[in-house]
Each structure stands twice: as C-alpha cells, then as structure tokens.
C-alpha cells in the first residue's frame, strides 16, 4: 500500500516567464525577465548591478520566445494529461493582465488567455496551482516607481491579485503569491525588480522591498479568502537547509544564521509576525523597516500552506572559502564532499529533502507542498531517436522515496510538482541545454530549433509512478 494519500496531487510545474514566449503578443507589457540577456551580462543584470531598461539589438533574450507555451498550451497540457497529472503548477504573467502594472482595469486579452489555459486543465481533471508573481515584475513599475522599494506596489499587486481571484474563481483554488520570495536577497532584479544606486545600503533596499512584498502577500491572502473561502493560498520558499561544514560550534552557528536568512520570509508569511531574531539582523545591517500604520495587523493574514522548491542541500561555515563554493539555485554554499553533483555542480541529496521537510513542518505546523524538484541535465538523442534519461529517473526516484519517508514521519504533504515538466528556459543561466523535462523541446541555447515536443524515457516512468500513487518507482 502506498504511503502517499489518495488525495495526493502529482504533477509538474512551468512558469510563464520561462515557457510562454510571445513576449509582446496580446498587448502584454515588458517585464524584468524580458530585459535579462543570455551570456556574459546576465548575472550582473540579475543582481541589479547593471541597469538594463532598454532592449538591445546585439543581445539574445531567451524569455522572448521561450518554448512557445502561449501558442502550444493545448499540446503541452495534453501531454501532462497523458502522464496522469492531478495538478499543473504555472504562473500568470502580471503584465499580460496589467501591461504597465498600474492600470485600473485589466487587459481582457490576458484574462481570456489564462481562462482558456485553466479550462484546458480542468477538461482533463487537472487542478491548476497558480503563482501570481514568478520573477516577472512589469518594467513600467521598475522605471517609474523603483519597483518593490516603493510602497505603491502593494496597492498595484493587491488590485492584480483581486482581479485574478475574481476572474478565475471556480477554475483555480490553489494559489501562490510570490515565487521563491527569499531569492530577492540573492538575485534582487530577478526577485523584485531592484536596481541599486552606487553607494546605497543594498540591505536597506532589499529588506524594505521585502516588507512591501510581505504586506502585499498577506493582503492577497486576505482578498483570496474574501473572494472564495475555499481558496487556499501558499507562500513559496527556495528551500534546502544548510548543514554546518563541521561540528565546530562556529560552523553550526553559521548554518543556523543562513537558514534564518532564507526562512525569514516564511516566518512572517506562516506565523504572521516578524521573528525575534530579525531585530538584531536589521540592526547589524543598518536596516530600518518603514512600516505603514496597520501593517502588523495585515501580516496576521497567514498562508494556508507552505510550498517550497528543493534541488539540493547546502553547507555553511564561519569561514566561507570561495575556492570551495557552489551556487545551488543562486544561493551560495560550500561544496559538500559527501555528495555527488549534477552537470551544473548542484549537490544531489535526497535525504536532505526529508531533513528539510521535517525542519519546516516542525517550524510552521502547516501542510507542505513540494512545487519544484528536478535534475537539470544535458539530454541527447540515442541512435534510435529516443532520450534515455535514466539519470533523471534515478534522481526523481530517490527524492520521491525521501518524500514518502517524510510522510511516514507524520508530515502532511499536499502534492509534488516536478520542475520543468516540459523543457523550459533556465531561470539561472538562460540556457535550454539545462533540461528538466519529461518532454524534450527542440530548441537550443541560441534560440534555434523547431520547438517539436518529444517524450523522454522519464515520461513513461513518471506516468507509472502517478498511476501507482508513488508505489511503483522502478
């Protein structure tokens, strides 16, 4: 008998900014991700260190066409249904509904598109799990308001959220507010549209922007419950706990501090108040949070569940050695000598998933939802035209087993959506060659290819996993 409950939501995940393409169709406005190029300038732009407010003819922007989900969503959702998906996680591009972000009324073409996507899901009995903001702030809000450093974005986001909850009521009941909200600290332009001026206190800017996002998230949660009490709203963490690099007490403390840095956002979203440790963190970083009257009351609108991504665990030491570092999901870490690594240097640690889940449930006592997990790898066609991605099957098998162990530990896990179920553009590198999917998309790092979809060996394996409710993993 399977350890997974009968109601368990098996599926996969994509994101608008990495799969839709059609970046100017349907009156869509430009977003932050549309300004992030492939190549040598990518990281500086993502970090908010290089200002890019105009597109350049000499640069390639992977998100502009991506994998063309905008025109091929029916084909892609049919492939998901063939695998037996119970849930499909995707996101709404804010600028498809509000091209500039600050309009009073939404763009009906955007609403019609997403309604059609969600209706297609429901046709196959697939529940949409929808992220409101997945690394794509409308560029007008960046250039005119300074993005999330400006309190006005709370108002704009609340209007956008209400529009979504009302327009898609009856089609969507599972919602996430901000994707990997803690990534703002590590990739500020990607996470929050932040661009820094020379000499300013970047920590002050990031944590003030974080406060605005946390208030906006809590308001959205409140609005969702007002529109339909059946709506369930979650937060979303870039997960993966930190191990101390040694049993040296200073390393243990360094790991605790790193965990707190990442969990700070979820502490607020799940508990409804700023954690006690944040006062000292802010003091030492020279940060003063400017709160509006009523903010503390708004923050009490906590999420219904805690969702997270998990790709790898991390290591921390009091003495971080740059020569022994890696960056799993843009979060800096020391290399763990006990782990094998992926093609991109991310440590493979299934037990770390079980550890992370236990830690998070102990901390929050709310249902968990693993909404991103997978192996980025280079896939090649065999002579017979097949893609035998046994390495991906092995990775997923061991992580599903770890999930099962966590459920046996007593943790309520709502579901599991593998990342990039159909190949997409990598958010971190902008590459297509870093593939996660059960379905291969014919497109290369330079944007060439037919976009033809091809089922990989893992497609048939995952179909079997879902059909057996996680019991048949061979």
UniProtKB/Swiss-Prot annotation:
Top EC class for this record: hydrolase
GO biological process: carbohydrate catabolic process; cellobiose catabolic process
Catalytic activity: 6-phospho-beta-D-glucosyl-(1->4)-D-glucose + H2O = D-glucose 6-phosphate + D-glucose
SUPFAM superfamilies hit by this protein: (Trans)glycosidases
GO cellular component: cytosol
Assigned EC number: 3.2.1.86
Any one GO MF annotation of this record: beta-glucosidase activity
Function: Can hydrolyze salicin, cellobiose, and probably arbutin.
Protein family membership: Belongs to the glycosyl hydrolase 1 family.
Stored PANTHER family: 6-PHOSPHO-BETA-GLUCOSIDASE ASCB-RELATED (PTHR10353:SF122), GLYCOSYL HYDROLASE (PTHR10353)
Protein name: 6-phospho-beta-glucosidase AscB
Source organism: Escherichia coli (strain K12)
Lineage per the UniProt record: Bacteria, Pseudomonadati, Pseudomonadota, Gammaproteobacteria, Enterobacterales
Gene: ascB
């Amino acid at each position: 008998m399977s350890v997974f409950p009968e109601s368990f939501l098996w599926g996969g995940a994509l994101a608008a900014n990495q799969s839709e393409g059609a970046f100017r169709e349907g009156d869509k406005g430009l977003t932050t991700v549309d300004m992030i190029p492939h190549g040598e300038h990518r990281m500086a732009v993502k970090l908010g260190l290089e200002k890019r407010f105009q597109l350049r003819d000499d640069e390639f922007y992977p998100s502009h066409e991506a994998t063309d989900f905008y025109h091929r969503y029916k084909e892609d959702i049919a492939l998901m249904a063939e695998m037996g998906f119970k849930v499909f996680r995707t996101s709404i591009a804010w600028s498809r509904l509000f091209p500039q972000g600050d309009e009073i009324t939404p763009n009906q073409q955007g609403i019609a598109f997403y309604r059609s996507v969600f209706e297609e899901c429901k046709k196959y009995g697939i529940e949409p799990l929808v992220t409101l903001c997945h690394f794509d702030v409308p560029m007008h809000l960046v250039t005119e308001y300074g993005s999330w450093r400006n309190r006005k974005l709370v108002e704009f986001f609340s209007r956008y959220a209400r529009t979504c909850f009302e327009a898609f009521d009856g089609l969507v009941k599972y919602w996430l507010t901000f994707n990997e909200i803690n990534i703002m600290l590590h990739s500020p332009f990607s996470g929050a549209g932040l661009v820094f001026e020379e000499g300013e206190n970047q920590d002050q800017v990031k944590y003030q922007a974080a406060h605005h996002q946390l208030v906006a998230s809590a308001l959205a949660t409140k609005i969702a419950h007002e529109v339909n009490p059946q709506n369930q709203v979650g937060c979303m963490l870039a997960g993966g706990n930190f191990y101390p690099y040694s049993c040296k007490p200073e390393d243990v403390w360094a790991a605790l501090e790193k965990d707190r840095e990442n969990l700070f956002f979820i502490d607020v979203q799940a508990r409804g108040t700023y954690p006690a440790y944040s006062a000292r963190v802010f003091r030492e970083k020279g940060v003063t949070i400017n709160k509006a009257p009523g903010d503390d009351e708004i923050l009490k609108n906590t999420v219904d569940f805690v969702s997270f991504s998990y790709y790898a665990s991390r290591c921390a030491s009091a003495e971080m050695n740059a020569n022994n570092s890696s960056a799993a999901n843009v979060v800096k870490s020391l290399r763990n000598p006990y782990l094998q690594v992926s093609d991109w240097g991310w440590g493979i640690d299934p037990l770390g998933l079980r550890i992370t889940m236990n830690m998070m449930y102990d901390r929050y006592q709310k249902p968990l939802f693993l909404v991103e997990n997978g192996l980025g790898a280079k896939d090649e066609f065999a002579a017979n035209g097949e893609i035998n991605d046994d390495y991906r099957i092995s990775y997923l098998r061991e992580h599903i087993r770890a999930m099962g162990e966590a459920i046996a530990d007593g943790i309520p896990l709502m579901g599991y959506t593998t990342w990039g179920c159909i190949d997409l553009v990598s958010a971190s590198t902008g590459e297509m060659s870093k593939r996660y999917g059960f379905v291969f998309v014919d497109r290369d790092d330079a944007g060439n290819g037919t976009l033809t979809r091809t089922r990989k060996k893992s497609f048939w394996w995952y179909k079997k996993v879902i059909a057996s409710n996680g019991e048949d993993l061979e």
